[in-house]
């Protein structure tokens, strides 16, 4: 067994890359004055090792460059130190060495810089992705097997099947984890970038990095480095003041920029914070009035620095960062205090492999949209038209309405009467797209459409559903811009007559279920309020005047539907409010509990039928 | 240029490609169309968890009367696709491909059992298809 030349080259390049990162870090430490002989010797060792491995495979240029760095460091060791002004030229030499090593095309690999003591294997990323495909498919087959066996046998087999499912889940989790890498794989270049930029700006800035061990999907890491560098540039160029201004404000002359990373629930938060001038009080005031500071800065490409530099303005490029992060299913937050500093937070999913999507159908085929981009779902009943284009009125705002089929130029039947429409929101832009039917909310594995279709606009990828069908996952920003420019986006949907119906509170912790019920009821003319659990619902019951009916799910966090029902019945003022229970619990005991607690009607989700539900509600809420 | 060839039928015509280029043959099954993709891409197929585009040989070769039921999976570097064919006829050696053809997707043609069999240029097919640039 022998490794190919290419494999050996790749190995040398990766090892040398680790050496270069350490050399750079040590040079920066020496420049700051904190370093000493220890750093000099470490650089010497790394230069020596790069020289050796480069020479061995005949890369003369790299070997010569490494050798010159080695010579310089040997001299420094004899002198017992390195003059600070010679750090600059040495950093350039390290750069040149990096370029010489990069002379050949690289292959993408997982695990670029392992912790020094743990044994590691390097695996091409495509192999891990293939593994994930197969594991995902095995899970589907297992479910089908479970279903098929469930109808013929019970007992012993089901335990074995449960165990199999647990093991498969574990397997899928570990494969997904193989796709993650620590943030430190991209942070190595940041101290240098900040140093170069600060000196270019004539400022003194120190960068502190915390939480570099935080794990993220490698695909996210690949794309996020540029965004972080952009935020660091913004902080140095526009956040941190000149030394004089800082001292006058009673701050230390050197500015401080912090890069922090850590888990926040199911997301990873990466923060870039500076102790600079912050945004102006006027802008903060405007943000208070108009909603969010990040939207204002991103939308207008606002710059807080009065002079124009060759570096990005505070807000310039922030829209690009925001779009990028949202495209990954994440979000952007920004806090600023005048005179005290600014903190930008990138919220990112830990893995791109798994994404929460809203699934729906158009023209007989399933599609998905990232939940992060879905504002709400409405039923299209009355439409207004603006400049001859159909639109919806939502919270007093006119939102363009399009047929999804028309937007992506898919062949398809006309839309049904009162179709559901998904309201997509991003960067203050909104558009509603109508489809045939909502399928629900699901966490899916996002797959590439393959190399041939990869460059195609409009899609983030595809997901394989439980029945083996492929759902195309749509790119929300593509739909938003299409909706804004397309000429005819929809045939006028059939309108229903309005009838004065009552006001209903829909309680469900599942977004899709809640919005589905809302859309059905709104289409029938009801005014609808929503709550996510029993506790919120109970509060809303007290607040809403003229509430006619409560439609509630049973299984919810905080306070479940039965508890909510009991609390309403125990309330003096609202004790007689009609309550309809909509649940997947169809068993006798649950029905009995519902009846005992005083439910007016009990609807089982599996038997869910729009017409019956509406009739029940009309009977109970009729005025 | 000989070797073992996979012979396929599209409409009333026969074509062949080297067996060494065929990853597998699968049922066409239900395809998911990808709106906005080039016309020769009829949809995407779920190949045991991997999503691959399916190319209509009939569209590429300007044929009619096709009733595709199978896909022949081929690959060039990272570019993997299924070629939609009506049926796989035979796997075996073919007479020397001596007839000249005038198609960018064929290298030559061979006369076998009184039929003209077009030799598919798999690389040309896979590199010719790409999504149109954004409008």
Stretches found by the model and what they are:
Chain B
Residues 1-135:
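An acidic, low-aromatic, low-complexity terminal/linker signal
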